[in-house]
From Swiss-Prot:
Source taxonomy: Bacteria, Pseudomonadati, Pseudomonadota, Gammaproteobacteria, Pseudomonadales
HAMAP family referenced in this protein's UniProt entry, alphabetically: UPF0149
Entry GO terms, CC: cytosol
Pfam families in the record: UPF0149
Superkingdom, taxonomy of origin: Bacteria
SUPFAM superfamilies the record matches: YgfB-like
Protein's name according to its UniProt entry: UPF0149 protein PputW619_5026
Family the UniProt entry places it in: Belongs to the UPF0149 family.
Amino acid sequence: MPNTQSPYTAFAALLSSNGHPVSPAELHGLLIGRSCAGAGFEADAWLADAAGVLENEPEDNVRAALIGLQEMVKAELTGEDIAIVLLLPSDETPLTERATALGQWCQGFIAGFGLNAGGKDLSTDAKEVLQDLVAISQVQEALEESEDGESDYMEVMEYLRVAPLLLYTELAAPAAPAPKPSLH
């Protein structure tokens, strides 16, 4: 087995070594939540929101990692893919730890979305997605180390890879340009 760190583990080590007691999953959820609410992709605004969660101003290496994370999220949300990659522990991590990180991701998403949604009208589907995220954020301890628990985790994770795209499309995606009238 190769001794390479997962992106989650590497980011967790970076945050911890710089005195930031926050999960990479929560930060990633915060970033995607704020982006889906229409906050845009300005680095300074993202860094300001992240600083609130980090509990102190990020050092240069953490700032660079946060900006890199934002660029990745921007590419995912504005690209052609129909799913996002969640920053979560690897599959080799015990299910309870992965479930906790999944809950933290949802909590971060809800916080980021709430900070930036500013009273926007939401469709019924968008409201259901947010209700699902709130429910998922609270079921962390319900998943057990079993085949059923693993299956439930994978199902929830797959849902979370696509559900935010509905919110992004509804609230934040740039509108397609209106067709220009043709002159005859």
